[in-house]
């Protein structure tokens, strides 16, 4: 049976990088693509950034590939993650030969809790002077992330780091840390605890101290973006939002309105997200081919302006397709 992939270009450069990734997927497999819409322009036209039809398509598809959203990002990506019941956001941050990186030895994977924390939407404006935010952390969600992390590092004998701020947020981050460490201990997986602010310093000084980092929602968002600065920028970071029966894949970068429409957006992060999608659908050989092609182009060129080159999105995509 042909697998169904929903593609949502979204706003800004999403409309430029998603077609590039679709061309790559077509080059390595036989998929049925269903295009859906979401984002700022959809809200202007219909009054809602994420139509129910798009939400339903993502919930029912074998996998979904999303580009970017602008001002309506929170109204689009958070519900889409809910649609696939995504409990973990997987964010690799890797430096590639040929790319000018602050820390070329960087090779990290962030496993970020994806349903709770300060992104769970419980904000209130109580007066002209006071707004509040409720942070939600449950043992069950923390354990589910930890179980995934144990599987990710190969189970017994593996290891990962737990980044938290339990010395200050004792109840919430304390609960997260305790749950993650307890699951790892039960599975025979070694853990190292690191305070998230200390991690930010240490990873800049020597990223080889770390490999797989398990974090609460906000910390994972911030720390993985920091890691992007070590490897050459957000244009290189893919991500996967994994649920029990569905998944959503997206580049970490945003809609980049400053360059949207110029045809110079770096498609690497989106194409690498497509490689993660292939892994998820058990097409590991094809995923490896895609990653190899991207790495070859990053090493030898052509490169988009964000990486010091003058190539267009189409030029880079064509070079990747040639290698496939």
Swiss-Prot record:
This entry's Enzyme Commission designation comes to 1.1.1.85
- What's a single GO CC term here? cytoplasm
Per UniProt, substrate binds at 81, 91, 112, 197
The record's listing under InterPro entries reads: IsoPropMal-DH-like_dom
Q: Name one Pfam family in it.
A: Iso_dh
Q: Can you state which reaction this protein catalyses?
A: (2R,3S)-3-isopropylmalate + NAD(+) = 4-methyl-2-oxopentanoate + CO2 + NADH
* Subcellular location(s) of the protein: Cytoplasm
Q: How is the cofactor bound?
A: Binds 1 Mg(2+) or Mn(2+) ion per subunit.
Q: What keyword terms does UniProt attach to this protein?
A: Amino-acid biosynthesis, Branched-chain amino acid biosynthesis, Cytoplasm, Leucine biosynthesis, Magnesium, Manganese, Metal-binding, NAD, Oxidoreductase
Q: Its biological function? A: Catalyzes the oxidation of 3-carboxy-2-hydroxy-4-methylpentanoate (3-isopropylmalate) to 3-carboxy-4-methyl-2-oxopentanoate. The product decarboxylates to 4-methyl-2 oxopentanoate.
The record's similarity note reads: Belongs to the isocitrate and isopropylmalate dehydrogenases family.
What is the name of the protein in this document? 3-isopropylmalate dehydrogenase
């Amino acid at each position: 049976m042909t697998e169904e992939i929903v593609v949502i270009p979204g706003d800004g450069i999403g409309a430029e990088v998603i077609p590039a990734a679709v061309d790559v997927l077509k080059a390595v497999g036989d998929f049925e693509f269903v295009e859906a819409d979401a984002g700022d322009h959809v809200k202007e036209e219909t009054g809602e950034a994420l139509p129910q039809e798009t939400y339903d398509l993502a919930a029912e598809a074998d996998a979904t590939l999303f580009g970017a959203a602008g001002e309506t990002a929170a109204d689009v990506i958070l519900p889409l993650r809910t649609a696939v019941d995504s409990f973990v956001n997987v964010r690799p941050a890797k430096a590639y030969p040929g790319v000018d990186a602050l820390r070329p030895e960087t090779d990290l994977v962030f496993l970020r809790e994806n349903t709770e924390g300060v992104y769970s939407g419980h904000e209130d404006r109580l007066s002209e002077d006071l707004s509040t935010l409720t942070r939600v952390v449950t043992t069950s969600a923390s354990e589910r992330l930890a179980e995934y992390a144990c599987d990710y590092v190969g189970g017994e004998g593996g290891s990962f780091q737990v980044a938290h701020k339990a010395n200050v947020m004792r109840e919430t981050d304390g609960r997260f840390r305790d749950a993650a460490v307890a699951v790892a201990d039960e599975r025979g997986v070694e853990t190292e605890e690191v305070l998230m602010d200390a991690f930010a310093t240490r990873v800049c000084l020597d990223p080889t101290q770390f490999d797989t980092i398990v974090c609460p929602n906000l910390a994972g968002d911030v720390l993985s973006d920091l890691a992007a600065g070590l490897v050459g920028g957000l244009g290189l970071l893919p991500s996967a939002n994994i649920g029990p029966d569905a998944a959503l894949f997206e580049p970490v970068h945003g809609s980049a309105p400053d360059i949207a429409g110029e045809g110079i957006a770096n498609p690497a992060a989106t194409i690498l997200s497509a490689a993660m999608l292939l892994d998820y659908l058990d097409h590991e050989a094809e995923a490896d081919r895609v990653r190899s092609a991207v790495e070859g182009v990053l090493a030898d060129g052509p490169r988009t302006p964000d990486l010091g080159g003058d190539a267009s999105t189409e030029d880079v995509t064509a070079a990747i397709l040639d290698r496939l």
